[in-house]
Amino acid sequence: MLFIDFCKILDKIEKTTKRLEKTDYFVELIDFIKNNGKAENLKQVSQITIGRVFAEFENKEIGIGPNLLIEAVKTTGISEKDLKAEIKKTGDIGIAVENLSSNIKQVSLFSQPLTLEEIYSTLKKLSEIEGNSSQKKKTRIISNLLILSNPVESRYISRLILEDMRIGMNIPTILASFSNYFNVNKEAVEKIYAVTNDIGLIGKKLISGSDIENDSELKLKVFRPIKPMLAQLTPSIEDAIIETKMPQFETKYDGARVQVHKSNGKVNIYSRRLENITNSVPELVEEINKIDIDNIILEGECVAMDLSSGKPRPFQDILRRFRRKYDIDKVAEKIALRIYFFDVLYYEKGLIDTPLKNRREILEKLFGTNNWDSELEKIQKEIFSNKMLFSSFKLNSDDPDLAKEFFNWSLSIGHEGIMIKNPDAPYTPGSRVKTMYKVKPTLENLDVVVTRAKIGMGKRKDWYGSYEISVKDDEDNLHVIGNVGSGLTEDDLERLTTIVNEIKIEDLGEEVILEPKIVLEVTYEEIQTSEKYEMGYALRFPRVVQIREDKSINDINTLDDVKKIYEIERNRK
């Protein structure tokens, strides 16, 4: 398949803001591939359209930043001065490269046109290049692609290299296109994506005529991690009890979500971003291997513990463990980890459609019960033990007063609050569900993404000291909700400045526009209505709690979350 044929449809998708039209254009692309291409082409375009070369579950990136792309563009005959001026003018490095390359006589005049397969395989190879001369090799490969491309192709190649296509396409739109073209149930194809996190594989299977609802490759599988199910906010414990009837309460741990996969004696542990962190936590792997279980996927919260106090250590200690690549044993001696398991998603077969109460029974056979109302003495002892693997502390009751006691006890041992779950509910990967709620003692902190950074003043003049922060809507569009600078240490500012310089896509002088990759957890005095921002809300006195390197843009809070918190707080006043 010629890359230019793909680009022509991408251009149509980019020029419309209407979701249904974008869906129709992708349907047109599927039809073109059906009649002119190969099944593999639909896999490739499904991923490329959303700025990916790898499936989401693989947690791999091309790893090229704007600075390296600019170096490659310079070798094609475009000056850095002209390029930066055009980027500033257009706000888009892809359009800047397209505009400037239109004025340059390309070597590709007598060469073969680029194919989709060439682009796809070349970009996959880029991610594998390592070593001392890796930057030069990458620059040369990117340069060759740009020289061989026509102006329109160069726009999309440049964006794809940065894994940001900027055409307003997302997974739900592609799934809707699959549903329309192949006449498959939309809910069914959404569920399949939830357990595979591989949009390309689904496309390839569909165009090959597979019965996707019964295809074993599209079922939940060990060593293919899934996105976690997410909880809703609730105004009160009483409201959540009404929603969940006889709920299961669990401690909301101050830790990091993990998935544990085990089969044939092999153990992999994944973070909530689906990163494989197995090598960073060898003591947990060793403990899991001691348990006589196989072909299983478990979910829990990894907590860094201070065994002298029985309370969790700061969240940053967990990130230190997860990021560590060297001297792991030394760090493990200082930072003790444990996992509180609260779900089993696979045990010899997929269990996500099984009610929580039945999944919990399986979990308790493996790790024992921890019923707060009847086993508190045992629980209190285990908190101070060297034991690493637990089932989560729980309470089954519809008594709000007892639930509040459990809530206060969970806070007293250093954790964040409680979860409230419907015991009859299935597990819905990657969705914020109405069968699971969270209760915390204060305003819910927000996870936001940084979209701009501004040079600081005074002591902060050497760093980016102020950050524009945004949440997302249902269409994954970003909405600014404020600016934050307080709460950041000098070490934080230095680290953030390094990252900003790697991901800035437009330089406005004192301010830069960024790829949305930095996630911050922020607290605030209140959410207030505001005409300053398009979304109509703003954070009053936001303050950074921590840099959430364990989270991506997929994990940030939504506009609906902001509205819900605003309403909850307004009703409390």
Curated annotation (Swiss-Prot):
Its EC number is 6.5.1.1. PROSITE patterns: DNA_LIGASE_A1 (PS00697), DNA_LIGASE_A2 (PS00333), DNA_LIGASE_A3 (PS50160). GO terms for biological process: cell division; DNA biosynthetic process; DNA recombination; DNA repair; lagging strand elongation. Keywords: ATP-binding, Cell cycle, Cell division, DNA damage, DNA recombination, DNA repair, DNA replication, Ligase, Magnesium, Metal-binding, Nucleotide-binding. GO terms for molecular function: ATP binding; DNA binding; DNA ligase (ATP) activity; metal ion binding. The active site is at residue 252. Signal peptide: none annotated. InterPro entries: ATP-dep_DNA_ligase, DNA_ligae_ATP-dep_bac/arc, DNA_ligase_ATP-dep, DNA_ligase_ATP-dep_C, DNA_ligase_ATP-dep_cent, DNA_ligase_ATP-dep_CS, DNA_ligase_ATP-dep_N, DNA_ligase_N_sf. It is an enzyme of class 6 (ligase). ATP binds at residues 250, 257, 272, 301, 342, 432, 438. It comes from the Archaea. Its cofactor is Mg(2+). It catalyses: ATP + (deoxyribonucleotide)n-3'-hydroxyl + 5'-phospho-(deoxyribonucleotide)m = (deoxyribonucleotide)n+m + AMP + diphosphate. DNA ligase that seals nicks in double-stranded DNA during DNA replication, DNA recombination and DNA repair. HAMAP family: DNA_ligase. Belongs to the ATP-dependent DNA ligase family. This is DNA ligase. It comes from Methanococcus maripaludis (strain C6 / ATCC BAA-1332).
